[in-house]
Design a protein with these regions (language model features):
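Short acidic, gly/pro-rich beta-turn/loop elements at beta-sheet edges
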Residues: 20-21, 26, 58, 114, ...
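Gram-positive Sec-dependent secretion signals
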Residues: 1-37, 393
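Beta-loop motif signature
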Residues: 30-177, 181-204, 214-241, 259-270
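Generic alpha-helical hydrophobic packing signal
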Residues: 75-77, 109, 177, 364-368, ...
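A short, surface-exposed beta-strand/turn
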Residues: 104, 111, 197-219, 306, ...
Length: 393
């Protein structure tokens, strides 16, 4: 792959991170002395108060049991505490047992020290919320890129995985933006919603790779994102040709795409995460093969996207006790993984894939994929090896 090293002008935009404002009801004054600071431990010992099941986490943070139990009085070293999905309105807390793939219900143990409570399914994720109707989307050059005829409602939540300054050559300004993690979003169809924003009809829309301006959103939850660059570097980098080390990094990242796609972490990631990685690869390949001049700012961004989306691939096989004798919960865990891998919801199709296990056969299952937009018509059926989705614990 060859990159043209001539100077390229790339526009971008800058944004200030907006933090939610917290107010005290009735203007009450709280003194510093009255606020007790909690010191959380990185790990602690818990003592089992009563016989309690050994848990493992399936796809979607689903809590399932292994069939084994912890005994009353047993001591365990734990290093995380968080809510687990039990298909109910609540997500009860469970401790992760250090050095294992197992968990134990928090209510059934007594902890020596406090651990900070996290959300297992959303840890590492960041959500921002629009503070106005019709908040626009932007491309890397800071030009508005909202699909024509569509708009976001006030209060729309976005999963974002990066914050960066982009330079807009037309306005000669750098502003900060959040990078949207996914490229499919629910939007109001303005053509069929004449009373927007009071009433509206929505559709799932492919917005492509996009940003939202920080001033148009408020931080909602998750990890605070630190910008990967500065306003000055965004402007300066748009006027400097791609650097040799950046060219080498891009070649290395694109050179290992086949290896990534053949890995378990890719194959067993959700279809959404695979699509996100695929889009980052396609965009980097397109930019690298085009005659368009590439700047160091654009190269930095393409490298960041490839590394970020590869790191978000999290596919893994279900760990089971006996590959020749699966428990009902182990089969359920495999089934949940299959749904995540083969389910797909885009602006063009809605597919649902599920596993059917045959009695007395723990070697294979039948994968069925249905088109949910076409009266649940069966698209395909295929015999799959369980060993491609599970491994001995």
């Amino acid at each position: 792959m060859k990159f043209n090293k001539k100077i390229l002008m790339i526009s971008a935009a800058t944004l200030m991170l907006v933090s939610p404002v917290t107010s005290l009801a009735n203007a009450n004054t709280v003194s510093a002395a009255s606020v007790k600071k909690v010191s959380y431990a990185k790990q602690t010992t818990v003592t089992v108060k009563k016989k309690t099941p050994q848990l493992f986490m399936a796809t979607g943070g689903r809590a399932l049991t292994t069939g084994k139990y912890y005994k009353k009085g047993q001591k365990l070293t734990v290093d995380q505490l968080g809510g687990m999905n039990i298909l109910a309105n609540s997500s009860p807390d469970a401790y992760h047992i250090k050095g294992t793939d197992y968990y134990v219900w928090a209510k059934d143990v007594k902890a020596k020290r406090a651990l900070q409570d996290i959300d297992y399914t959303s840890r590492g994720l960041t959500t921002v919320r629009t503070n106005k109707s019709k908040a626009p989307l932007y491309s890397f050059d800071a030009e508005k890129s909202t699909p024509a005829g569509y708009a976001f409602m006030k209060g729309t939540d976005f999963k974002v995985n990066g914050a960066m300054y982009l330079y807009n050559a037309k306005t000669d300004k750098s502003e900060l933006y959040y990078h949207l993690t996914n490229h499919y979003h629910t939007m109001a169809n303005l053509k069929t919603s004449p009373d927007f924003p009071n009433r509206f009809n929505t559709e799932l829309v492919d917005t492509g790779d996009a940003f939202v301006k920080a001033s148009d959103v408020n931080f909602f939850s998750g990890k605070k994102l630190k910008p990967i660059n500065t306003a000055a570097s965004a402007k300066d980098g748009s006027k400097i040709a791609i650097l040799e080390n950046q060219e080498a990094d891009l070649k290395d990242l694109l050179g290992k795409v086949d290896s990534v796609k053949n890995s378990v972490k890719y194959k067993l990631s959700s279809s959404l995460k695979r699509d996100n990685y695929d889009l980052a690869v396609r965009d980097a390949q397109t930019q690298g093969n085009s005659r368009k001049l590439m700047s160091t700012a654009e190269a930095q961004y393409l490298i960041w996207r490839l590394k970020t989306y590869e790191s978000e691939l999290d596919g893994a096989k279900v760990k089971v006790g006996n590959m020749n004798k699966l428990t009902s919960n182990e089969k359920l865990a495999i089934g949940l993984l299959v749904i995540s891998v083969y389910g797909k919801n885009t602006d063009k199709e809605s597919l649902y894939g599920y596993a059917k296990f045959n009695k007395g056969n723990d070697k294979t299952f039948t994968l069925t994929i249905k088109d949910m937009h076409n009266q649940k018509k069966v698209v395909s059926t295929k015999t799959m090896k369980i060993s491609d989705f599970a491994q001995k614990r």
